[in-house]
A protein has these predicted regions:
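Active-site charged/polar residues at nucleotide-handling catalytic sites that mediate phosphoryl
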Residues: 32, 90, 106
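Acidic catalytic patch
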Residues: 17, 69-89
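A generic structural signal for short hydrophobic patches within well-formed alpha-helices
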Residues: 11, 44, 80, 118-119
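Conserved glycosyltransferase catalytic-site signature
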Residues: 8, 41, 96-100
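Acidic, PIN/NYN-like endoribonuclease modules and their adjacent C-terminal/linker elements
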Residues: 1-3, 70, 100-131
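Short, well-structured N-terminal submotif of metal-dependent ribonuclease cores
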Residues: 1-39, 51-62, 116, 130-131
Length: 131
């Protein structure tokens, strides 16, 4: 059983019922039936901005319910230092490097995303499930 880190974009597609991507995200998650899915506080932040900004309480509750089903991973300072190195080496955006560093730090077997830029820096850890 592997530990799989989920990028916020995939949760957004699934929870908000994106017409093109929701079913593909669900299928990708279902194909990993023996895995434990994990997120960081950064994923929560990214997911909750829209419903908080728009005041959409129903959407906020859907996010909170979905996020609460996932394993929360802490983000100690070492993750931020690793993210700085990744940003310096690969030129990725700070949130992307934090996701990757968190997955690496916690020994995740995969980081699922739709972000092609992360694949090179991830050295096989990152999988774009929407290709």
């Amino acid at each position: 059983m592997g530990l799989i880190y989920l990028d916020a974009c995939l949760l957004t597609y699934a929870i908000e019922e994106h017409p093109l991507w929701a079913d593909k995200v669900r299928a990708a998650l279902e194909s990993e039936s023996d895995a434990r899915f994990a997120i960081s506080p950064l994923v929560k932040l990214e997911c909750l901005v829209k419903p908080l900004k728009t005041g959409d309480i129903a959407l906020q509750r859907r996010y909170e319910a979905g996020l609460n089903e996932l394993l929360p991973l802490p983000m100690p300072e070492t993750i931020f230092l690793q993210a700085a190195m990744l940003r310096a080496c690969f030129g990725l955006k700070t949130p992307d490097t934090l996701h990757l560093a968190a997955a690496q730090h916690h020994g995740c077997t995969a980081l699922l995303t739709n972000n092609d830029r992360l694949e090179q820096a991830g050295h096989g850890l990152v999988r774009n499930v929407l290709k």
